[in-house]
């Protein structure tokens, strides 16, 4: 096989780019990365993780660019987030792919760098979104979407122990009486519906592959359903391979396989990530990451952002009129929804619930809240505002 198309360095997902090729540290690409706060370093072909250690960044949030199949193979085994093979004039592209490269390019200019985002610490408090102004909600009719884990619920060591924070369900109930409300989760649909337990709202599970409307009608992505047997097989193999590592939990969901490593030793995380990425390559499944989790799901162009657009369009066709989408989320998978909220026909309000798991990473959100407890308070204040007729 030859080269791939353009690949993207995304500061929301990547803290550093490590080069195993020539004078790349002096390239225009390296300069552009420095301008947006993404670190760079050179690697040794046999130990790319050492460069990540020097920069104090995790391999799971780093990119490796290398022209040596041995370096590509070492980066893949260490669990790096993105491994790019560099094959000038198409030389050894097949060898780089066989070694585990996610993409093969002929020149560094094929790499695109995402710009324009702000760091989490730079965002204003979401209380400002309750006022007027171009980005505010005063005088507008919102449709409010929530992630669950890390947004309505605190992140806990045992995913099965997650529950909405105090006041969250009462605030959701009040809000749902005044505007459309949806919970979009990576959990199974039945799981998140039971945990939240608020009637009369939208629930989407598995990042939107399956959802129920307030009237109880069920919708699913039939293309994703075709991958259910493959996901089951992958879950079984990963349980056998990783289940003996202390602190690792392999969660088989209807439309995904989530491997949690929050409680695992840090020196085993690369091994876990490498195993999941290898399973994704073997079974042609998409690999996504989150807060101390790496997941397999159907390799389809569908995410929380597209789910949000689908729900908004459904509401529009049902006569809801012009709605301003609001999305509250904390994780990398929520960035798709932030992009959708900002890029839709109506400028919406993307709100990040801050955390420390990924450092001060970049985000497409425009506002922030400091915890799920603050998210519950924001929801209550928005319900108050709508009850007073100020929405």
Swiss-Prot record:
Its cofactor is Mg(2+). Pathway: Glycan biosynthesis; trehalose biosynthesis. InterPro entries: HAD-like_sf, HAD-SF_hydro_IIB, HAD_sf, OTSB-like, Trehalose_PPase. It comes from the Bacteria. It catalyses: alpha,alpha-trehalose 6-phosphate + H2O = alpha,alpha-trehalose + phosphate. Its EC number is 3.1.3.12. Mg(2+) binds at residues 147, 149, 330. Removes the phosphate from trehalose 6-phosphate to produce free trehalose. Pfam families: Trehalose_PPase (PF02358). Belongs to the trehalose phosphatase family. GO terms for molecular function: metal ion binding; trehalose-phosphatase activity. One of its GO terms (biological process) is trehalose biosynthetic process. Substrate binds at residues 147-149. The keyword Oxidoreductase does not apply. This is Trehalose-phosphate phosphatase. Keywords: Hydrolase, Magnesium, Metal-binding. The active site is at 147 (nucleophile).
């Amino acid at each position: 096989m030859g080269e791939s198309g353009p690949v993207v360095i995304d500061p929301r997902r990547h803290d550093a780019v490590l080069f195993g090729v020539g004078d790349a540290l002096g390239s225009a690409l390296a300069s552009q990365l420095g301008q947006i706060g993404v670190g760079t370093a050179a690697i040794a072909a046999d130990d790319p993780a050492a460069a990540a250690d020097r920069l104090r960044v995790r391999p799971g949030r780093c990119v490796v660019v290398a022209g040596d199949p041995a370096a590509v193979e070492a980066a893949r085994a260490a669990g790096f987030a993105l491994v790019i093979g560099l094959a000038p004039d198409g030389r050894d592209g097949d060898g780089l792919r066989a070694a585990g490269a996610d993409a093969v390019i002929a020149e560094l200019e094929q790499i695109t760098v995402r710009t324009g985002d702000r760091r989490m610490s730079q965002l204003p408090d979401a209380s400002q979104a309750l006022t007027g102004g171009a980005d505010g909600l005063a005088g507008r009719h919102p449709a409010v979407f929530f992630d669950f884990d890390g947004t309505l619920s605190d992140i806990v060591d045992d995913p099965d122990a997650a529950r909405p924070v105090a006041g969250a369900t009462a605030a959701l109930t009040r809000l749902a009486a005044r505007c459309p409300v949806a919970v979009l989760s990576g959990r199974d649909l039945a799981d998140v519906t039971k945990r939240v337990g608020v009637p009369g709202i939208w629930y989407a599970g598995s990042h939107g592959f399956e959802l129920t409307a307030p009237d109880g009608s069920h919708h699913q992505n039939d293309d994703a359903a075709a991958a259910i047997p493959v996901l089951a097989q992958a879950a079984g193999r990963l349980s056998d391979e990783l289940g003996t590592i202390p602190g690792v939990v392999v969660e088989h969901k209807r439309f995904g396989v989530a491997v949690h490593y929050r409680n695992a030793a840090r020196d085993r995380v690369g091994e876990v990530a490498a195993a999941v990425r290898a399973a994704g390559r073997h079974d042609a499944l998409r690999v996504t990451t989150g807060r101390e989790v790496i997941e397999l799901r159907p390799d389809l162009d569908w995410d929380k952002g597209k789910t949000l657009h689908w729900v908004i369009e459904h509401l529009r066709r049902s006569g809801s009129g012009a709605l301003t989408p609001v999305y509250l989320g904390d994780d990398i998978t929520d960035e798709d929804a932030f992009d959708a909220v900002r890029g839709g026909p109506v400028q919406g309000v993307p709100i990040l619930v801050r955390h420390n798991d990924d450092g001060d990473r970049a985000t497409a959100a425009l506002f922030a809240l400091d915890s799920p407890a603050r998210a519950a308070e924001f929801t209550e204040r928005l319900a108050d505002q709508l009850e007073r007729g100020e929405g």
